């Protein structure tokens, strides 16, 4: 009977064992062994010595570099708040990877951030910029001295009014409104300006651009700026047109009365744009998902709150014209897109079967004259990457939580987060240059890997499990890291 029973057992049957908890007295194990790649990158960059230049402490028990590195490690392992550094501190194997580093307690990390002033925050920003210069040289070669940068802002909500300089934003959200500048092709952050919530979208944008364009000029002959309608301003356009700057720009246009007259002019010819013949299906899908539909989605969300629904009824059409903005006193090229949509009210019974059709318009102003309308649209449509970068910086990296009560402490935390963000970009650039993934996927593939950490006289050995079949991958990445950094 027993044999017959075993023979007929379901193929889905599992014999889940009984469990017992023990702690090893000799072997160090971590679930974040992939951080040895980050540790090697940090070692080769001489990052520890550079952060000592901050000179925040007079009497040092724990140096500035250790505090900053603790916050970086916390973000790489998935910590959302300073409090989570206690789990980094509890991981002895992880500390061994970073040279028996002494991890400060969470409240000590908080105290460290609160020591930052305007001067030390600027110093931290400059140190991170110097680290980035080496990778700007590499990007210059990779992209043939041409680069596209993307400027945007984002609102961070806080609760209560205990955080210094927090205020009501244009979205009626109480908090902060930082300005972010990305490298469009790679997602690398060039700069962050931390601002009160009440700051206008473009506040500080010209100063940010001036500081960063001067950094890029030695490495890139062509610089293109992409920006949203919040940066449709005379000061920004004039900056781009300055004789000593001369960069190209594509900025989302406002739709005011003079622009409407141009859009509705009888002579205006609207055509369906030609699609690139060399695009793969995946590229088309990715491009279309970020085309001006993200603007259309904003309209859809807004109307849904009023009980309306929007449906697309027509093909995408494009047109262009030259227009002189009165305040700018100069003529520029405007490129616009439109799509026929239908609006229907689902709440009001009297209008349930009534629908109105109209065109939804979205356009840009540019000083680029040597590219076709399709090329301009293709480039600006990909600006949706910036929205995804900001979302991943907030949610993936974990900057959504504002850690301290002090304004410059929070600014410093955002700069340290920028360092974490860029370390990921720099690491991938070396070991998998074609790979662009979000933080959740990055941690899963590269960081969250269990291994024994064994310290010997000459090495710290990363010993993966017997059945772990990705040892060759990690060996390949480590070799690439060593070769690139030694080159």
List the predicted regions and their residue ranges:
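Dynamic "connector" segments at or just before major functional cores
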Residues: 1-174, 180-200, 206-221, 242-243, ...
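An anionic, glycine-rich sequence signature occurring as long contiguous blocks
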Residues: 2-18, 248-389, 393-395, 451, ...
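Conserved nucleotidyltransferase catalytic core and NTase-mimicking acidic/glycine-rich helix/loop elements
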Residues: 7, 428-451
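Short, solvent-exposed helix-loop connector elements
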Residues: 52-59, 372-380, 396-412, 427-439, ...
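Short amphipathic alpha-helical "interface-anchor" segments enriched in bulky aromatics
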Residues: 85, 90, 274, 281, ...
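A short acidic (Asp/Glu
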Residues: 160-161, 233-240, 260-264
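Acidic, metal-coordinating catalytic cores used for nucleic-acid/nucleotide bond scission
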Residues: 225-233, 254-258
